[in-house]
Amino acid sequence: MRIFSALGLVAMYSMSAQPRYAVDGEPAAGPGTPAVVVLRDRIAGVEAAVAPSEGGELSSFRMKRKGEWIEFLYHARDYSPGPGFKGKGPVLWPAVGAQYPVGTVPAASCGPGTYPVAGKTYPMPCHGFARNLPWKELRRSADAKGARVTVQLRDSSETLPSYPFAFQVDATYELSGGQLTINYTVTAGATNTSEMMFSIGNHIAFKLPFVTGTDPGKMTFETSSTTQLLRNSQGVLSGEEKPRTFKTPERLEDFDARVALPLAGYGSRPYAQLVDPQGVSLRLTQQAGSTVGEPLVRFNLYGGPKAGFLCPEPFFGVQNSLNSGHGLVRLARGKEWNWRLELRVDAH
């Protein structure tokens, strides 16, 4: 976040005829460049772009520093076809990770799977289906308090074969005071005949380094975890855990998370922070409207300097939750549940 004095803010306002906050739509410009909604904070020099047609995801998050833009997301606004990790900030819902019958081994670490509901087996893509479907833009606005856009996903003929529930998921992106807040509201349909169950996450990917010329291995990471959930020799969660904390910042060169580290044991406001030694830091905080019992992964750390990205992967759930029953939010019909992410940058 940029910090300005009151007099400085007044002076900057007086020099500019433009309002501090704005929201603009940029139309699609052909294959690989979908339409996006851009939120702008002109005083803080921060912008965020949302792509409704691409899973309603965060497509870009950037800050102007010393006259140049610093983009924080890996493959920001890049939708060109091709293999490999796509980056950006896709929402993971109604599952995080692969889903497979308890006691079996998934065919791939993040491949398609299955889970049961009322005696019937349903398919479920890895990390759920929300990121693979177009979302509808509901509204956008800007005023003296900030700029915001709300996108929505509802049950449809495309979702019912893999998720037999009526639902509504709203994601409101709001830029205010240099901070981006993403509010997710999940609502169970009034026609459901049983509790709706889900986990949620975001596979947000930050590019390494933030500042051109930095050795990414010298960047540091910290988070308020106390434990790590362990995997067995077949790569699935074993049910065991060990103490693991990043409360003291660690250099990225000192660990490799190409095999994801499921981190748990957090307090009420879990956070993760990345710091570029050239004076740029980013802090990601999450907060849920209500909690569930442990085990509960809050950050699923993935990537590193060799990969060129780091994904803190904020979760509210656990891998294979739809089969194990752990880390599940359960909603009665007509009820709603909220989850919030906050992204704040600081530069000097």
Annotate each predicted stretch with a short phrase.
Residues 18-183, 189-348:
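Surface-exposed acidic/polar loop and edge beta-strand patches at domain peripheries
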Residues 7-17:
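Hydrophobic h-region of N-terminal signal peptides that target proteins for export
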